[in-house]
UniProtKB/Swiss-Prot annotation:
Residues at the active site: C174 (thioimidate intermediate)
GO MF annotation list: GMP reductase activity
One Pfam family per UniProt: IMPDH
One GO cellular component term: GMP reductase complex
Species of the source: Staphylococcus aureus (strain bovine RF122 / ET3-1)
Record key words, sorted: NADP, Oxidoreductase
EC number assigned by the record: 1.7.1.7
InterPro entries, sorted: Aldolase_TIM, GMP_reductase, GuaC_type_2, IMP_DH/GMP_Rdtase_CS, IMP_DH_GMPRt
Substrates-to-products reaction catalysed: IMP + NH4(+) + NADP(+) = GMP + NADPH + 2 H(+)
Function: Catalyzes the irreversible NADPH-dependent deamination of GMP to IMP. It functions in the conversion of nucleobase, nucleoside and nucleotide derivatives of G to A nucleotides, and in maintaining the intracellular balance of A and G nucleotides.
Residue positions binding NADP(+): 203-226
Family: Belongs to the IMPDH/GMPR family. GuaC type 2 subfamily.
Protein name from the UniProt record: GMP reductase
Main EC class the enzyme belongs to: oxidoreductase
Length: 325
């Protein structure tokens, strides 16, 4: 089994067939809708909120609303769908969440996307929730996770998941790998590669993305969609407190299983950090799209499919050549 991560890989260019990178198409059909880029912000409180969710939907970007304000979910679905936009929510696996799904069915509220959002998604509770959703609201596109093995992907797909999230603890504010000894931190890209061999349905690569080039690498190794937290945090439009440290502006960014999110010091597998203010989120999205268009042009194609077949080399932890600050 080849083990590697994002910084160990360089993709090998093919002959370019476009005059300009602007000819390259970055769109992706994911579930019932088509999106501008194969990227989704992490469903975390310091990355996504209702205002941003609406802007993303209006502008043909995928989003997943977090699940940490449970009472707000039904009004959110109604507001989005009454505005002619798609609703994409998250659920957990506690008993109340099973009741919540039944309530949606009773009220004939059918979110276009439901993400079952659990740190260790290869579990009976997630399998039961997938089946529960598919029984009561079969028209919702169900994303389940997170997993780190082909067995996990297969079991969730067999239960009825329409897409699976791959990644156990590789994120910047996730400390699962340190607290538990388990996870895909340090080999997330290889885990994605292995999982893709078993997958029959789309995969979302979740965690460990540090550069825009990592998006192209994720697609090469089997992802249809790439979930990103830290690169989307700390923008003007981002949720989270802005603080000034040594004359510079920062925003807080914390993990979904951190004490800052939970409000208590119990079962903590996330940490909090301050990320330097990055300016406009719209500028970052535009730059991501342009960089991905460049990636496609280097792959010798005109759309995302061309990235899936490029050759690569493994250059252990050396692609930055010491260029890190």
């Amino acid at each position: 089994m080849k083990i590697f991560d994002y910084e160990d890989i360089q993709l090998i260019p093919n002959k370019c067939i476009v005059e300009s990178r602007s000819e390259c198409d970055t769109t992706i059909q994911f579930g019932p809708k088509k999106f501008k880029i194969p990227v989704v912000p992490a469903n975390m409180q310091t990355v996504m909120n209702e205002k941003l969710a609406k802007w993303f939907a209006e502008n043909d970007y995928f989003y997943i609303m977090h699940r940490f304000d449970e009472e707000a979910r039904i009004p959110f679905i109604k507001h989005m769908q009454n505005s002619g936009l798609f609703a994409s929510i998250s659920v957990g696996v506690k008993k109340a969440e099973f009741d919540f799904i039944e309530k949606l069915a009773q009220e004939k509220l059918i979110p276009e996307y439901i993400t079952i959002d659990i740190a260790h998604g290869h579990s009976d509770s997630v399998i039961n929730m997938i089946k529960h959703i598919k029984t009561h609201i079969p028209d919702s596109f169900v994303i389940a996770g997170n997993v780190g093995t082909p067995e996990g992907v297969r079991e969730l797909e067999n239960a009825g998941a329409d897409a699976t999230k791959v990644g156990i603890g590789p994120g910047r504010v996730c400390i699962t790998k340190i607290k538990t000894g388990f996870g895909t931190g340090g080999w997330q890209l290889a885990a994605l590669n292995i999982c893709s061999k078993a997958a029959r349905k789309p995969l979302i690569a979740d965690g460990g993305i540090r550069t825009h080039g990592d998006i192209a690498k994720s697609i090469r190794f089997g992802a249809s969609m790439v979930m990103i937290g830290s690169l989307f945090a700390a923008h003007e439009e981002s949720p989270g407190e802005t603080v000034e440290l040594d004359g510079k502006q920062y925003k807080e960014y914390f993990g979904s299983a951190s004490e800052f999110q939970k409000g208590e010091h119990k079962n903590v597998e996330g940490k909090k950090m301050f990320v330097e203010h990055k300016g406009s989120l719209m500028d970052t999205l535009k730059e991501m799209q342009q960089d991905l268009q460049s990636s496609i042009s280097y792959a010798g194609g005109k759309d995302l499919k061309s990235l899936r077949t490029v050759d690569y080399v493994i250059v252990r932890n050396s692609i930055f050549n010491g260029d890190r600050d």
